[in-house]
C-alpha cells in the first residue's frame, strides 16, 4: 500500500520532465562525488542507471520507501492495517521526501540510504545480541552515511523512539536498557569511524581532496565553541522545520497550522502514555525517557556538531518524519478509541496536505521548465543570428537572476498577485528560470538544442566584469544585451554581478 500511495502522491513528478537548477547539470552523472564524502552514492544510484529517468527512479524510490515502512512496522510490532498504511503514507508524503524528488537524479540512492538506516536500528534491537546482527547494523549505518550523511539522523531518531517504546512497555530491566545504550554507542562509533576511514582511504587512492560543500572539509575538527553553535543551530532548525518561518514573518499557512496541532497532540499523548504505563514509578526509566526526548533535537541535525559550515534543509530532515510516525503509534497504544480515531483523521489530513504541497511544487517546477525552455530557445536564435557576422570562443553569463525570478501568480477573481512562497514550502528553490550561470546555460542549451557552448573561465569573466563595454550593455531581453567582447559571447541579464 505504501508503494501505491507514494506513487500516486508523486505521479506528476515521475511522469513529467520537471528539473530543478541542479537537475540540468545531471542529465547523466555517475554521482561519484567522493569529495563530498558520499563514497557509496555512485553505487546506490547506479541501480537505476546514471541517467535522470523520472519514472524508473521513482519506482525504485517507492520500493525503498515501502521497505523502510515494513522495517518500521516490524520494529514496533504493529499489526493494525490502518496504522501500517498511515506510516507508509507519512514517509511517502513527508517534506523531506518531497524535496528529495526535486533532486530526482539521486532520489533512489537517498531512499536506499533511508532503508539502510532503518535496517541498522532493526538489527540492533534490545532482544538481538548476535554478533552477526551487530555487524550488519554497523555496515548499514556505514553504507547509509556513505550514500548520504543526513540519514544517520534518521537511524538515531528511530533508535530513540524505539528505546522510548521499550521504556514504556516495562519489559526490560534497568541493566538491559543500559546494555542496549552501550551497544548503540559502540555500533555508531565504529560505523562512523569506519565510514571516515573508507572515505579517507578512497581519497588517498584517487588523489581527490575534500571540497567545501556543507563544510565537509572541516569534518572532525571539533571544539567547545562548535558544540555550543551546533546546539543553538539544531534548536533553531528543529523549530523552523515545523513553522517554516511563517509565524516568525507574520504569515501562517496550512502546513504550519497542522504542525502546531501536531506538537500539541504529541505533548498530550506523551503525558497520557507516562500516566497509563506508570513510568513515573520507575525513576531511572523516567530519567532515561526525559533524556530521550531532549536528545531528539541534537540528533535530528547531528552534523551541526561536526562542522560550522553545514546548512540544513528539508531533504536532510527525514528523521522528523519518525516523530509523526511514533506519535501515531502512541495514540494507537494508549489513547481511548475516540481519540485514536481523531488522531487517525488528523494524520490522514496531514498526508493529504503534504500531497497537495508536493503537487503545487511540481506545478511550479513545470512552469519553471517551460519558461527556461522558451527563454533558452530565444537565446539560441539570437546566437545563430549573431554567428552570421561574428565568431566567439566561449560564453559568459552576467547577472544574478534569482533576485527577480520568484514566481507570482494572479488570482483572476480578486486580481491580486500571490507569491509562490506563501503557497508551498520550498519557494526558495523554485525560480522562474533554471539558468543562473554560464555552466547551467551552456549545458541546458547543449542538451536540448545541440549547440555546444564553452563556459568562459573565471579569469575571463572577471576581466569582462570590469570592462566599460559590459557596463554600457542593456539587460536581457534588450537587443544589445548580447555581445561579443574579446572573443567571448556575453549575455547580460541584469546588473547584479
Task: Identify the residue ranges that each predicted region occupies.
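Hydrophobic, aromatic-rich transmembrane alpha-helices
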Residues: 243-285
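Perimembrane helix-loop-helix junctions
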Residues: 154-189
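Signature aromatic-anchored transmembrane alpha helix within multi-pass, membrane-resident enzymes
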Residues: 131-135, 332-358
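Membrane-interface alpha helices of multi-pass inner-membrane proteins
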Residues: 133-149, 154, 160
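Intrinsically disordered, polar/acidic, low-complexity terminal segments
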Residues: 1-35, 39, 45-67, 76-88, ...
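Transmembrane alpha-helix segments characteristic
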Residues: 91-92, 279-305, 349-351
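Membrane-interface transmembrane helices that cradle and orient dolichyl/undecaprenyl
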Residues: 117-133, 166-172
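Membrane-interface micro-motifs in multi-pass membrane enzymes
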Residues: 34, 38, 61, 82-125, ...
Amino acid at each position: 500500500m505504501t508503494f501505491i500511495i507514494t506513487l500516486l502522491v508523486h505521479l506528476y513528478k515521475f511522469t513529467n520532465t520537471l528539473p530543478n537548477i541542479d537537475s540540468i547539470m545531471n542529465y547523466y552523472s555517475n554521482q561519484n562525488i567522493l569529495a563530498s564524502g558520499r563514497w557509496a552514492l555512485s553505487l546506490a544510484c547506479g541501480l537505476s542507471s546514471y541517467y535522470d529517468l523520472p519514472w524508473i527512479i521513482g519506482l525504485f524510490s517507492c520500493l525503498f520507501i515501502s521497505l523502510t515502512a515494513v522495517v518500521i512496522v516490524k520494529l514496533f510490532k504493529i499489526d493494525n492495517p490502518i496504522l501500517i498504511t498511515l506510516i507508509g503514507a507519512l514517509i511517502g508524503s513527508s517534506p523531506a521526501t518531497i524535496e528529495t524528488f526535486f533532486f530526482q537524479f539521486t532520489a533512489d540512492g537517498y531512499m536506499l540510504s533511508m532503508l539502510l538506516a532503518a535496517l541498522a536500528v532493526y538489527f540492533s534491537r534490545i532482544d538481538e545480541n548476535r554478533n552477526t546482527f551487530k555487524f550488519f547494523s554497523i555496515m548499514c549505518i556505514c553504507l547509509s552515511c556513505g550514500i548520504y550523511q543526513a540519514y544517520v539522523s534518521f537511524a538515531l531518531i528511530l533508535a530513540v523512539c524505539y528505546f522510548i517504546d521499550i521504556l514504556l512497555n516495562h519489559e526490560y530491566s534497568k541493566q538491559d536498557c543500559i546494555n542496549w545504550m552501550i551497544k548503540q554507542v559502540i555500533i555508531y562509533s565504529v560505523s562512523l569511524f569506519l565510514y571516515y576511514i573508507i572515505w579517507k582511504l578512497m581519497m588517498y587512492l584517487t588523489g581527490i581532496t575534500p571540497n567545501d560543500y556543507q563544510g565537509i572539509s572541516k569534518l572532525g575538527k571539533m571544539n567547545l565553541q562548535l558544540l555550543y553553535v551546533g546546539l543553538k543551530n539544531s534548536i533553531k532548525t528543529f523549530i523552523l522545520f515545523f513553522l517554516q518561518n511563517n509565524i516568525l514573518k507574520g504569515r501562517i499557512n496550512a502546513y504550519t497550522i497542522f504542525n502546531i496541532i501536531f506538537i500539541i497532540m504529541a505533548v498530550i499523548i506523551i503525558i497520557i502514555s507516562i500516566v497509563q504505563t506508570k513510568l513515573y514509578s520507575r525513576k531511572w526509566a523516567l530519567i532515561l525517557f526525559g533524556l530521550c526526548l531532549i536528545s531528539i533535537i541534537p540528533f535530528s541535525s547531528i552534523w551541526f556538531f561536526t562542522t560550522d559550515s553545514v546548512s540544513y534543509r528539508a531533504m536532510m530532515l527525514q528523521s522528523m518524519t519518525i516523530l509523526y510516525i511514533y506519535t501515531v503509534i502512541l495514540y494507537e497504544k494508549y489513547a481511548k478509541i475516540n481519540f485514536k480515531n481523531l488522531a487517525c483523521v488528523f494524520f490522514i489530513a496531514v498526508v493529504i496536505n503534504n500531497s497537495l504541497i508536493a503537487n503545487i511544487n511540481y506545478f511550479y517546477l513545470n512552469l519553471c521548465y517551460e519558461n527556461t525552455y522558451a527563454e533558452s530557445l530565444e537565446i539560441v536564435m539570437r546566437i545563430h543570428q549573431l554567428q552570421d557576422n561574428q565568431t566567439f570562443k566561449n560564453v559568459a553569463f552576467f547577472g544574478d537572476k534569482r533576485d527577480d525570478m520568484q514566481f507570482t501568480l494572479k488570482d483572476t477573481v480578486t486580481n491580486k498577485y500571490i507569491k509562490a512562497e506563501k503557497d508551498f514550502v520550498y519557494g526558495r528553490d523554485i525560480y522562474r528560470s533554471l539558468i543562473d550561470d554560464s555552466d547551467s546555460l551552456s549545458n541546458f542549451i547543449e542538451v536540448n538544442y545541440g549547440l555546444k557552448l564553452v563556459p568562459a573561465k573565471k579569469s575571463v569573466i572577471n576581466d569582462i566584469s570590469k570592462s566599460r563595454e559590459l557596463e554600457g550593455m542593456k539587460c536581457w531581453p534588450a537587443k544589445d544585451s548580447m555581445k561579443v567582447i574579446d572573443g567571448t559571447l556575453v549575455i547580460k541579464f541584469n546588473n547584479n554581478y
